[in-house]
A protein has these predicted regions:
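Residue-identity detector for glycine
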Residues: 8-9, 22, 54, 81
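A short, structured beta-strand/loop element
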Residues: 14-55
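Acidic, low-complexity intrinsically disordered segments
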Residues: 53-82
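Negatively charged, low-complexity tracts enriched in Asp/Glu with abundant Ser/Thr
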Residues: 1-15
């Protein structure tokens, strides 16, 4: 996994290389005092969410908006192995 972005709330967004099926795994993780970490997994280019733990619906929407606005960069960096 490659680091992509750290948000002001300490949320980390990382991504895989381009996988054999042409998708890119994006993992979002945020530290939480009570639960240790909240996290979710999204696959590009379909924006398929496969796992959400600890995030509210509002947080999921916020992070998906960020992923959608930066997907072209994530896909490009994944193809380059960065």
């Amino acid at each position: 996994m490659y680091p992509f972005m750290t948000l002001n709330d300490n949320t980390e967004i990382v991504h895989s290389e381009t996988l054999d099926d042409g998708t890119v795994k994006v993992y979002i993780e945020k530290p939480d005092e009570k639960d240790c970490f909240h996290h979710m997994t999204v696959y590009l280019p379909s924006y398929k969410i496969t796992e959400v733990t600890g995030f509210t619906d509002e947080e999921v929407k916020k992070y998906m908006d960020i992923i959608k606005s930066k997907a072209h960069l994530i896909i490009q960096f994944a193809a380059e192995g960065d």
